[in-house]
Amino acid sequence: MIQYFKNINQQTVEIDKPEIGTWVNVLPPLKQEEFSELSTGLDIPIDFLTDSLDIDERSRFEEEDNVKLIVIKTPTENNSFNESDAYYITIPICIILTHNQILTVNSFDNPAIKKFLNTFQNRHPDKKNMMVLKVFEKVVQNY
C-alpha cells in the first residue's frame, strides 16, 4: 500500500499521487508492481525500494544518481514470539531522499512510523533533513 502526504495550508493531507514536496509512505501489503511504478515514476533504483524486505538488512547510507538511501533498524515486538524466540526483533526502515520527495518503506507494520504519522501535522515534507531526524526520534522513543 502506498500513501502520499503533503502539507497544504498548514495541514497535512493525504493526496492521490506524488507531487513535489510529498512524503511517500510504503507499507504492507507490498506489491512488486507498486515498487516498479515507484522506481520508474520517481527515478529511484528498484533495490532501494526492495531493501526493506530483507529482515537481515544492515543499517547503512548509500547514494546513487542523487538519490540517498538510509536504512535503519528499529526494534519491535516479535509477533511470532514463543519460548525459544526473542521478545523483540529489529526490522529495517528504508528512508529514501530524492530531489522532490521523501519516501519511507516498511516491510512490517512499524509502530515508530505509526507514531510519526500521528504527529505529522504541520510538518513540511520539503524539509527532508528535519523529517529524517523526526523519524529517528520516533524510533528512539518507541524503543
Language-model regions: role of each:
Residues 1-143:
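Peripheral, non-transmembrane regulatory/ligand-interaction domains of membrane transport proteins
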